[in-house]
Regions:
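Gly-rich Lys/Arg/Thr-decorated short loops/hinges at beta-loop-alpha junctions or inter-strand turns
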Residues: 1, 29-32, 58, 138-149
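Active-site mouth loops of central-metabolism enzymes
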Residues: 1-13, 34, 60-75, 94, ...
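Metal-associated gating/positioning segment near the N- to mid-region
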Residues: 1-56
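Short, acidic/polar
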Residues: 11-19, 69-82, 163-164
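Acidic-and-aromatic substrate-binding clefts and catalytic sites of carbohydrate-active enzymes
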Residues: 38-40, 70-72, 99-100
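Alpha-helix-loop-beta-strand connector modules within alpha/beta enzyme cores
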Residues: 42-60, 64, 107-122
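Histidine/acidic residue-rich metal-binding segments in metalloenzymes
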Residues: 77-254
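Short phosphate-coordinating micro-motif centered on Lys-Gly-acidic
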Residues: 257
Length: 259
């Protein structure tokens, strides 16, 4: 809701429309994301979102905190203080130029979460592998929406999921792996749960409604862009694996991930 966006991009929801919709659907509390930008104080980030929201809310509202710049001040002062103020869930990214955290940064955020008894959500895709594959596709002129999926195949998600789980083991905290797209990442979550590792997982409608074949023939326009998400839709086998994970309880959360 009301996230920073690029030129000519307008979010479908502002705080007024989103919380009104929530109320109409019977939801009395919402927690959208407050996204820290590089170089920004986390406290300043949270205050700016509250400023946008104030006077435009129809239900109770707080925020999940997206940590993109875990500076010593953020980790040592701001994040612990905000956790004690009641902001008890964070989100971190293992990809995207403006959001990615390296392994040491992930571990440090996890450590704060453990100390403050908060929960961390993880977007698990391998940044360097995606950059490598994207550069190859761009050099070959393969730019259509279909190739987005080829730039971040299942192995990239599988590797990052396993790495996130391993980091959580090192620090000994529970984490949530969000928007799981296919059977390879799902296999890592099952592996962890079978060993008693404290892992939760989420998937979304796009992974049971779409496959990579739906991306074929799309153009470089807004209609094509509507199908682009990360992680991308996978093959039919993965679609079935996601259905099975929902049915057998491997997934703890099923949500729209709508942005």
């Amino acid at each position: 809701i009301d996230q920073p966006s690029g030129p000519d991009v307008e979010m479908a929801d502002n705080f007024q429309s989103a919380t009104r919709s929530a109320a109409a659907g019977g939801n009395t509390t919402v927690l959208p994301f407050a996204m820290q930008e590089k170089g920004q104080s986390l406290r300043e980030c949270v205050e700016s979102y509250h400023k946008k929201a104030n006077g435009n809310l129809f239900v109770d509202t707080s925020f999940h905190l997206i940590i993109s710049d875990p500076s010593p001040q953020v980790l040592g002062q701001e994040l612990p203080a905000l956790a004690r103020d009641g902001y008890t869930s964070f989100k971190v990214f293992m990809t995207y130029d403006d959001l990615v955290l390296n392994d040491e940064e992930l571990l440090k955020v996890f450590e704060v979460a453990k100390n403050e008894k908060t929960l961390v959500m993880v977007h698990a895709e391998g940044y360097d592998a995606i950059r490598f594959l994207t550069k190859k596709l761009e050099d070959e002129g393969k730019l259509a929406p279909y190739y987005h999926g080829l730039s971040r195949p299942q192995i990239v998600e599988r590797e990052a999921t396993h790495r996130a789980i391993s980091h959580a083991q090192i620090v000994d905290i529970p984490i949530v792996i969000v928007h799981v797209s296919g059977e390879e990442a799902l296999s890592q979550i099952k592996w962890a749960k079978e060993r008693g590792i404290k892992i939760f997982s989420e998937t979304c409608p796009q992974y049971i409604c779409l496959t990579e074949d739906d991306m074929k023939g799309l153009n470089m326009d807004f209609e094509g862009a509507k199908y682009v998400c990360s992680p991308p839709p996978r093959d039919l086998e993965s679609q079935q694996a996601i259905w099975d994970g929902l049915i057998d309880g491997t997934f703890d959360i099923f949500s729209s991930d709508h942005c």
